[in-house]
């Protein structure tokens, strides 16, 4: 079969890591030909994939034009389908404003559209709610086949989008974590005698990183002897930190996938204050790197981490601070989280299993499409 891997809409966030990981596995499916449409953010993969005889890459950033949103047509992508006699399209993550007229599997990772009971909804205004309704419509009209990374989300999506088929393919850490020779040691953190909490993430509103300001305030007042810093992978200008608390924070900007393992090596705790997720690769990444996890006491987090994390009440800065302090000072407890994490990893699809499942789903829906024709 001829299959388009559509990553033309990916600019930042966890989708970049998933697309990178999936594309690196395509060489194993020699019975299929892949046309991989890379956004400029993923353009570096052209060199990585050039040795694979069954993979062709093109770099293209799909424009978010009114015409494309309304009609679902994109001349460049439609021409790719026609010229390469494509059987099916796998959009790594939507929403896909392009609506191909062939079998189409679309990844769904917009928890905001389904987890309506999240504390996040107390933080957003009318503008955000309208945006979510547009996303909801774009997803619903873009495909008849979806996959999510969490069975709980799959169930919610199936109920919400009646008449569609929803598959579950869990996320994992990128294969570069198992290839130490490819780790980039470019992000060396300043020396620090204390506990380093790492959060690898784009500064999305639902990640709730502002809680760290209140965590720092609490720790500076209640536990002044406890030395801790928070390493964040976005720019300082994205989050206003009071001058008297700046020593708690280390902003290092965006990082490449290959730079992440070394950051984990330099850290003591993975802290993730997110209020909603379908999945976040930072959980399995921390498990793989042997780091204890501190995260929110919410259903999706429990479903992904089980006994491998220390949980705190989602919007309670004091609880977050106490959880960090407990993990940092109770070495036996921290080690138990790490050991539980190694066991929890076995429950996820590995990067190879994820690729196998996605290609198998494409084979199924493309075959079904041929039969219907």
What residue ranges belong to the model's regions?
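Membrane-proximal helix-turn-helix segments that form the acceptor-binding/catalytic region
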Residues: 125-146
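Aromatic "clamp/platform" in nucleotide-sugar-dependent glycosyltransferases that forms part
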Residues: 275
